[in-house]
Swiss-Prot record:
Domain Glutamine amidotransferase type-1: 4-204
Gene: guaA
GO molecular function, one term: GMP synthase activity
Enzyme class label: ligase
Name of the protein in its database record: GMP synthase [glutamine-hydrolyzing]
Lineage of the organism: Bacteria, Pseudomonadati, Rhodothermota, Rhodothermia, Rhodothermales
Annotated catalysed reactions: XMP + L-glutamine + ATP + H2O = GMP + L-glutamate + AMP + diphosphate + 2 H(+)
Length: 526
């Protein structure tokens, strides 16, 4: 049984990053909404609890409050469960226990120099190995002015006289800055100090240990029964297939559907990898005609998603019945590459929200198909799945691949989908990706792709006027896809890509580059 740190989510955009940073220190972490009661946290048997930041003020009526019973939690040895409050987490903790939090006249945002007096390092394990004068990242409006009884300041900045505190009677700490972001120089050290030195975690949780444990868990659960998996060629389903084959061998049956909306070369690449490299039972079917006939004339993105999703389910069920006929019985389990962010989206603290777009994952099959689910990665982040893929010898062109939406190129063609427009987009996209790889930029961005727009523009090729399609290029940097910034690719590089596409893809005469961040935009255009 591994040690565990629980992260309570108060609505911060960095909550997932906190959990990931803790895991990087070899300690397993889980996210729970801040509204969960202390008894439910206690049932998880945590070695420590981290309170995330958040957008609210402790004075907001709708602002989340801290359950005071958190300070009564004990570990099996009878010692208190340590707490670390980050930004709003610090303010909520201090406010709950009698401290004073003041509204700031203006927001403090950006880098600051952390001043840790020598006695602060001596008094607190939190700053062991953290030099005074190191850079930290501030992002807050309210600030702590009077400490709760028994608390003392252990660090400050020029603009924040209370940058970090501790309880002199218990293992309770708070910082006004964000140790989880890369802009905080020694942020990982601070989180490692909390997890290891303060919480006493051993740091034995690793992707390699996960593979061994999951392999045994899957074998024990499945026994001599059979599993099917919808293979898309993306990272999650591909690594899931490799793990399940390691555990089950020929009890795994993969289904790969060509919906006519794949990237250039993807249909052959996936078959070569999983039939050739892994020697899996891979059932393939080319349903291009069926998908494109149903998408004919459709322009609404939500309708596209619905058609692609429903048609996929139909084809998937046909292939499942064929597998059942070969086996003489229906497979018991359906495996999916669900990731931890997919789950914590439904449990994190949120205010009022609206559906922006239906989730890209079309692998969510209806209950009437009557499978038991196996989701081996439901507790992992994308970067952890990539690392596991490398441990399982999944080829790098697949394990390092950028995210690709379930509806495929259907939502990267704005407007009507035709075979001709799909061919244009595939070629433009392939050139963009090829050049990113050739210039060692592919791994520097979270996601990159081309989008075919529903407009045409005037151009000149030689001495002739052209009136052809406009193609947009999109590249973003991100940690988890929840927020993203447009990638600041070199202008010379973009110019070269533009020239190649316009000269090598007849039918496109103009290239534009998307410089929108998420939010307010989304990563995909539809």
């Amino acid at each position: 049984m591994h040690d565990k740190i629980v992260v309570l989510d108060f609505g911060s955009q960095y909550t997932q990053l906190i959990a990931r940073r803790v895991r990087e220190t070899g300690v397993y972490s889980e996210i729970r909404p801040c509204t969960v009661e202390a008894d439910a946290i206690d049932a998880l048997n945590p070695s420590g609890v981290i309170l995330s930041g958040g957008p609210c003020s402790v004075y907001d009526e709708a602002g989340p409050a801290l359950d005071p019973a958190l300070l009564e939690l004990e570990r099996p040895d009878g010692t208190p469960v340590p707490l670390l409050g980050i930004c709003y987490g610090l303010q909520a903790m201090a406010h709950q226990f009698g401290g004073e939090v003041a509204r700031a006249d203006r927001r403090e945002f950006g880098r600051a120099q952390l001043q840790v007096p020598p006695d602060g390092q001596e008094k607190s394990l939190l700053f062991e190995g953290v030099p005074s004068g190191s850079t930290v990242w501030m992002s807050h409006s309210d600030h702590l002015t009077d400490l709760p009884d028994g608390y003392e300041v252990i660090a400050r900045t020029d603009n924040a006289p209370v940058a970090a505190v501790r309880d002199t009677d218990g293992p309770y700490y708070g910082v006004q800055f964000h140790p989880e972001v890369v802009h905080t120089d020694y942020g990982r050290q601070i989180l490692e100090n909390f997890a290891h030195a303060i919480c006493g975690c051993s740091g034995d949780w690793t992707p390699a240990s996960f593979v061994e444990e999951q392999t045994e868990t899957i074998r024990d659960r499945v026994g001599d029964r059979h599993v099917i998996l919808g293979l898309s060629g993306g990272v999650d389903s591909s690594v899931a297939a490799a793990l399940l084959q390691r555990a089950l061998g020929d009890q795994l049956h993969c289904i790969f559907v060509n919906n006519g909306l794949l990237r250039k070369g993807e249909w052959n690449q996936v078959q070569d990898t999983f039939r050739g490299h892994f020697e899996m039972d891979l059932r393939t079917t080319d349903a291009t005609d069926r998908f494109l006939e149903r998408l004919d004339g459709v322009t609404d993105p939500e309708e596209k998603r619905t058609i692609v999703g429903n048609t996929f389910i139909e084809v998937f069920e046909e292939q499942t019945e064929a597998i059942a006929a070969d086996l003489g019985h229906r497979p018991t389990y359906l495996a999916q590459g669900t990731l931890y962010p997919d789950l914590i989206e439904s449990v994190s603290f949120k205010g009022p929200s609206v559906t922006i777009k239906t989730h890209h994952n079309v692998g969510g099959l209806p209950e009437e198909l009557d499978f038991d689910l196996i989701e081996p990665f439901r507790e992992l982040f994308k970067d952890e799945v990539r690392e596991i893929g490398r441990l399982l010898d999944v080829p790098d062109p697949i394990v390092g691949r950028h995210p690709f939406p379930g509806p495929g190129l259907a939502i990267r063609i704005l407007g009507q989908i035709t075979r001709e427009r799909l061919a244009l987009l595939r070629e433009a996209d392939a050139i963009f990706i090829e050049e990113l790889r050739a210039n060692d930029l592919y791994d520097e961005v979270w996601q990159a792709f081309a989008v075919l727009l529903p407009v045409q523009a005037v151009g000149v090729m030689g001495d002739e006027r052209t009136y052809e399609n406009v193609c947009a290029l999109r590249a973003v940097t991100s940690v988890d896809g929840m927020t993203a910034d447009w990638a600041h690719l070199p202008h010379d590089f973009l110019g070269h890509v533009s020239n190649r596409i316009v000269n090598e893809v007849p039918g496109i005469n103009r290239i534009v580059y998307d410089v929108s961040s998420k939010p307010p935009a989304t990563i995909e255009w539809e």
